[in-house]
From Swiss-Prot:
Chain segments carrying region Interphase loop: 462-479
Organism encoding this protein: Mus musculus
Ranges where the record places region Gate loop 1: 396-410
PTM sites of type N-acetylserine: S2
Keywords: Acetylation, Biological rhythms, Cytoplasm, Differentiation, DNA damage, Immunity, Innate immunity, Isopeptide bond, Methyltransferase, Nucleus, Oogenesis, Phosphoprotein, RNA-binding, S-adenosyl-L-methionine, Spermatogenesis, Transferase, Ubl conjugation
Pfam families assigned to the protein according to its UniProt record, in alphabetical order: MT-A70
Name used for this protein in its record: N(6)-adenosine-methyltransferase catalytic subunit METTL3
A GO term from the CC aspect: RNA N6-methyladenosine methyltransferase complex
Domain of life per record: Eukaryota
Motif, Nuclear localization signal: chain positions: 210-215
Listed EC numbers: 2.1.1.348
Renumbered residue ranges of the record's region Positively charged region required for RNA-binding: 465-478
Length: 580
């Protein structure tokens, strides 16, 4: 870049010398050019820095000789300081070169007047600034800066710092060089016409400097700008602080929520016993290198005459259908309590702690209505006589193309069930599995429910391990079941956020769902009427009416339900309607 700039400065000074000679020629009284010796007046020395003597003319004084000053080397640090000073928005314009030199000079790196003047001329040629200095003024008068293009100066400052954009700057300088050459050619042509055939001469263009390789490392200026842009403003910090305070308020539990949680908290302590990780007492003592097993619950191996211990544990354990002949190892709970174990009596749950106690004097939530049930075929029962319910739960016998120990319902029979009459506002819990998951969603929409949640039951075996050899599943063994949760209308008075949507429980008999689901539903809607469809004897629960064809007769206690049932079925027999 410096070689190109030097060439431009040399051309500009040659132009100034030629223009000065033309001005002096015009001021002569004769106003005519000496054609006998035109080279003495018009031929500038483009190739030499030494002054060229001119021959005397007959009608005027000798023109003064002009020499081209040697080009100063450009100081990168001085150029950077000058760019930074000129790009300052607080700089008052116009200002002269002397004031600029004093402003950017430091004791460690003083700036010279010639260097500042040269850089100002360079910036003016690059159209970064505008300077005011007449062609005929003396060199003693400093250059006056009248205008500064701050956007271009900022861009140039970044280019100098990063040493990027070298090609763009070189292109701009090359354009200035071409314009200077065009001006020089025009003046030379005019002088040749006045000299009646004077041979025109032009300087050879300077060679283009080779392009330097661009460096991709980020400069300190870019890093500082990026850090400033990444910093949050005061307004953003205040807004973030307010948002955090609002979030903390929203996440804080209210007094009502705390009261509800306390209402359903286990009294005294949880009435459960934890299983030992090592299974049997022998493995527990071996692992802990102790004389006695831990106080957790253990298992005992069942070793029969036909048992082959080398085969390992049975995959189905206590759910095995052929335990009388199965050769694999089975287990049972080792309920024997070591009375000599220290602290064993302290950890035995007392009967007093297991009693239900009311909280806050309000016993309405703790009041449970005795269980009720009706043995019937749900397809033919007029369920409208049972009234309205807050929660409906169903475990339908889906036709999943598998041999089951009970009868199944077809898809059309499931769709025709009169479920909508049981509720105006409330929740429906629908157990689905396999291909029935899509059919269950279809039935929810058909019955007027919107699916809002889905409970997952992760099945564990007797040893509290994940099931890997389930009896269901075609491509993969199923180790879980799904319970779709649908909502109808606008239910009020339900508790939100008390339980999660995952149940981890042991597998029992076929289609025997975990008892934890009843606790979840009771905490969701305490003290309300609930009904379960397709239930069995183990499903009867307080506050629930259970319907199914495997129950023991009819057991109704609600006076209103009893009256409507006797009116609809006087003989107590629920038979298939004649129109079906």
């Amino acid at each position: 870049m410096s070689d190109t700039w030097s060439s431009i400065q040399a051309h500009k000074k040659q132009l100034d010398s030629l223009r000065e000679r033309l001005q002096r020629r015009r001021k002569q009284d004769s106003g005519h050019l000496d054609l006998r010796n035109p080279e003495a007046a018009l031929s500038p020395t483009f190739r030499s820095d030494s002054p060229v003597p001119t021959a005397p003319t007959s009608s005027g004084p000798k023109p003064s000789t002009t020499s081209v000053a040697p080009e100063l080397a450009t100081d990168p640090e001085l150029e950077k300081k000058l760019l930074h000073h000129l790009s300052d928005l607080a700089l008052t314009l116009p200002t002269d070169a002397v004031s600029i030199r004093l402003a950017i000079s430091t004791p460690d790196a003083p700036a010279t007047q010639d260097g500042v003047e040269s850089l100002l001329q360079k910036f003016a040629a690059q159209e970064l600034i505008e300077v005011k200095r007449g062609l005929l003024q003396d060199d003693a008068h400093p250059t006056l800066v009248t205008y500064a293009d701050h956007s271009k100066l900022s861009a140039m400052m970044g280019a100098v710092a990063d040493k990027k954009g070298l090609g763009e700057v070189a292109g701009t300088i090359a354009g200035q060089k071409r314009r200077a050459e065009q001006d020089l050619t025009t003046v030379t042509t005019f002088a040749s016409s006045l000299a009646s055939g004077l041979a025109s001469s032009a300087s050879e263009p300077a060679k283009e400097p080779a392009k330097k390789s661009r460096k991709h490392a980020a400069s300190d200026v870019d890093l500082e700008i990026e850090s400033l842009l990444n910093q949050q403003s005061t307004k953003e910090q205040q807004s973030k602080k307010v948002s955090q305070e609002i979030l903390e308020l929203l996440n804080t539990t209210t007094a009502k929520e705390q009261s509800i949680v306390e209402k359903f908290r286990s009294r005294g302590r949880a009435q459960v016993q934890e299983f030992c990780d090592y299974g049997t007492k022998e493995e527990c003592m071996k692992a802990s290198d102790a004389d006695r097993p831990c106080r957790k619950l253990h298992f005992r191996r069942i070793i029969n005459k036909h048992t082959d211990e080398s085969l390992g544990d049975c995959s189905f354990l206590n759910t095995c259908f052929h335990m009388d002949t199965c050769k694999y190892v089975h287990y049972e709970i080792d309920a024997c309590v070591d009375s000599e174990s220290p602290g064993s009596k302290e950890h035995m749950p007392s009967q007093e702690l297991a009693l239900t106690q009311s909280v806050g004097g309000d016993s309405s939530a703790d009041r449970l209505f005795p269980p009720q049930w009706i043995c019937c075929d749900i397809r033919y029962l007029d369920v409208s006589i049972l009234g309205k319910f807050a929660v409906v739960m169903a475990d339908p016998p889906w036709d999943i193309h598998m041999e089951l120990p009970y009868g199944t319902l077809t898809d059309d029979e499931m769709r025709r069930l009169n479920i909508p009459v049981l509720q105006d506002d409330g929740f429906l819990f629908l157990w689905v599995t396999g291909r029935a998951m899509e059919l269950g969603r279809e039935c929810l929409n058909l019955w007027g429910y919107e699916r809002v949640d889905e409970i997952i039951w992760v099945k564990t075996n007797q040893l509290q391990r994940i099931i890997r050899t389930g009896r269901t599943g075609h491509w993969l063994n199923h180790g879980k079941e799904h319970c779709l949760v649908g909502v109808k209308g606008n239910p009020q008075g339900f508790n939100q956020g008390l339980d999660c949507d995952v149940i981890v429980a042991e597998v029992r008999s076929t289609s025997h769902k975990p008892d934890e689901i009843y606790g979840m539903i009771e905490r969701l809607s305490p003290g309300t009427r609930k009904i379960e469809l397709f239930g069995r004897p183990h499903n009867v629960q307080p506050n629930w009416i259970t319907l199914g064809n495997q129950l023991d007769g009819i057991h109704l206690l609600d006076p209103d339900v009893v009256a409507r049932f006797k009116q609809r079925y006087p003989d107590g027999i629920i038979s298939k309607p004649k129109n079906l």
